[in-house]
């Protein structure tokens, strides 16, 4: 059996200018990064005769290895193309932290990949490096401001802007800077986040154009004065420099699938510690050019899909016409109590228990009023009895189920899912927001925790409650909420699998992100700088004297 990278290496790619031509984009509309990658110059002209349908792919709570949501996404896009629908896949860029850590890349798998997979999973077009440079330039400017006058009285103890790196590096979570004497700056305690957690990543993914990006950058709160008043980038006059560093990164990236379907891969916030959606500009561009735009939101529907619908959708101005919930037999069994070592065996009892996890995700999407289908991402170890149990469960809830064999067969293995999605997208949907945006941040957190997660109550730390009082005084109550929590559980405890009910959900702290336009609520012990596992993916990779890489997935 070939590995993902071996399959990708054997693929015959179409020159990117020909992929662009499929969308009506001529060579002046793109900036090529080699033969198979390009940036799309903005704005693009909409194609009025297209259907402009939006399909959101989400999933149940995953196992640590992930459940192939990106694989199903790509397979679905290729299947829609095989059915002669102009289709564009809109997805996030991978972070090199997980690529070299535990989860691996994010370009799909098997015969459902976006390519060139090696480039996309590594440095791609440099967007993450530009974001890292912009973020850290702002951090350096802040430290310089503290040292050279500090006219606004920014309190070094209350600077909340952190540096970032696109690596999993737990040693950088808490650091002290400015040591070494008076010429080395003002000593202060700070830390590093991973680049996808940066507010600049969220801003890049929510900005509607370069002017909006600059306006959002200017609204970033970097810290507070000695009088506890917020200080923004705009007050410091640093927004121009930061925006200059992002002027190319804001342009969406165009690549292709193994089936030669156009794919716009742009932006990469994580869904557990950020809002987990690709850029608004990428999705809008795809919608303007295609009959069907197939996009994804990170991790389970409790994280990525909720944030897509409550944070991204209002900016995008478009509600999904259909939702696909990806489930796997192994993840359902894992959520039902099976050990990771037993997931290759038939575990009908654990599978039945784990179906409660899927059922809650179904109910959550139905609460929004969206047409949906469940896609079973097929693994070779799945048995007919396991598949039937899932099908019977979903049919009892009025939801159709389709088995997708995207990894092994690409678009051809996902045709049934594509036909179901086309039928769903023609239905009339009546979207219902989860919460009132005029509600307080506390009320919004409680709504998400009780209605989406199944919590009985929310416990706020003393620090969080004090922050809520401050936010009310500052007029920040109308911002949406972005909860940072574990992806493995509906709770804030990653060991509580399945579909727990009536539990206490814990919020320890809030982080205002006015540039992005939301407030982050940190739940449990969620960290914004991941660490590496005992055996990182990095140690399984090799490169030979000719530059050929193995072990990348």
UniProtKB/Swiss-Prot annotation:
Binding site for ATP: 63-70
EC id: 6.3.4.3
Keyword Ribosomal protein assigned: no
Annotated metabolic or biological route of this protein: One-carbon metabolism; tetrahydrofolate interconversion
Gene Ontology terms for molecular function: ATP binding; formate-tetrahydrofolate ligase activity
Pfam families: FTHFS
Reactions the enzyme catalyzes: (6S)-5,6,7,8-tetrahydrofolate + formate + ATP = (6R)-10-formyltetrahydrofolate + ADP + phosphate
GO biological process, one term: tetrahydrofolate interconversion
Swiss-Prot/TrEMBL keywords: ATP-binding, Ligase, Nucleotide-binding, One-carbon metabolism
SUPFAM superfamilies: P-loop containing nucleoside triphosphate hydrolases
Cross-referenced InterPro entries: Formate_THF_ligase (IPR000559), Formate_THF_ligase_CS (IPR020628), P-loop_NTPase (IPR027417)
Protein family (similarity comment): Belongs to the formate--tetrahydrofolate ligase family.
HAMAP family: FTHFS
Identification of the protein by name: Formate--tetrahydrofolate ligase
Organism: Limosilactobacillus fermentum (strain NBRC 3956 / LMG 18251)
């Amino acid at each position: 059996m070939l590995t993902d990278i071996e399959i990708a290496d054997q693929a015959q790619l179409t020159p990117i200018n020909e992929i662009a031509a499929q969308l009506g984009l001529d060579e002046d509309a793109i900036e090529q990064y080699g033969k198979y990658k390009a940036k799309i110059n903005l704005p693009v002209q909409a194609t009025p005769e297209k259907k402009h349908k939006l399909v959101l792919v989400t999933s149940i709570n995953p196992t640590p290895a992930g459940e192939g949501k990106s694989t199903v996404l790509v397979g679905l896009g290729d299947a829609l193309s095989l059915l002669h629908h102009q289709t564009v896949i809109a997805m996030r860029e991978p972070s090199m932290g997980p690529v070299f850590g535990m989860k691996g890349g994010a370009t799909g798998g098997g015969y459902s990949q976006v390519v060139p997979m090696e480039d996309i999973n590594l440095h791609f077009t440099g967007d993450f490096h530009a974001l890292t440079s912009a973020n850290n330039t702002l951090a350096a400017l802040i430290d310089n401001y503290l040292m050279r006058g500090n006219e606004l009285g920014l309190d070094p103890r209350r600077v909340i802007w952190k540096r970032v790196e696109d690596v999993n590096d737990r040693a950088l979570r808490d650091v002290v800077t400015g040591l070494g004497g008076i010429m080395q700056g003002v000593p202060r305690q700070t830390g590093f986040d991973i680049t996808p957690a940066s507010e600049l990543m969220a801003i890049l993914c929510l900005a509607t154009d370069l002017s909006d990006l600059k306006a959002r950058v200017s609204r970033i709160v970097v810290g507070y004065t000695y009088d506890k008043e917020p200080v923004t980038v705009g007050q410091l006059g640093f927004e121009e420099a930061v925006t200059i560093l992002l002027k190319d990164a804001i342009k969406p990236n165009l690549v292709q699938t193994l089936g030669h379907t156009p794919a716009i891969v742009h932006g990469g916030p994580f869904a557990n510690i950020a809002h987990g959606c690709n850029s608004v500009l990428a999705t809008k561009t795809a919608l303007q050019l295609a009959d069907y735009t197939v996009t994804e939101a990170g991790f389970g529907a409790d994280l990525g899909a909720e944030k897509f619908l409550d944070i991204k959708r209002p900016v995008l101005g478009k509600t999904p016409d259909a939702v696909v919930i990806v489930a796997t037999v192994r993840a359902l069994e894992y959520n039902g109590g099976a050990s990771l070592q037993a997931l290759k065996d038939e575990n009908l009892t654990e599978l039945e228990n784990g179906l409660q996890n899927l059922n809650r995700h179904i109910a959550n999407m139905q609460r929004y009023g969206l047409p949906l289908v469940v896609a079973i991402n097929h693994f070779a170890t799945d048995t007919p009895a396991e598949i039937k149990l899932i099908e019977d469960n979903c049919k009892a809830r009025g939801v159709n189920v389709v088995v997708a064999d995207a990894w092994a067969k690409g678009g051809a293995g996902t045709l049934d899912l594509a036909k179901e999605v086309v039928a769903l997208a023609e239905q009339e949907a009546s979207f219902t927001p989860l919460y009132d945006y005029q509600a307080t941040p506390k009320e919004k957190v409680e709504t998400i925790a009780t209605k989406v997660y199944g919590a009985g109550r929310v416990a706020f730390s003393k620090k969080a409650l004090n922050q809520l009082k401050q936010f009310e005084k500052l007029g920040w109550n109308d911002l949406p909420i972005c909860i940072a929590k574990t992806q493995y559980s509906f709770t804030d405890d990653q060991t509580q699998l399945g579909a727990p009910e009536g539990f206490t959900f814990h919020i320890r702290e809030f982080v205002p992100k006015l540039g992005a336009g939301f407030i982050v609520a940190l739940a449990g012990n969620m960290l914004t700088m991941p660490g590496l596992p005992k055996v990182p993916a990095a140690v399984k990779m090799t490169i030979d004297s000719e530059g050929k890489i193995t072990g990348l997935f």
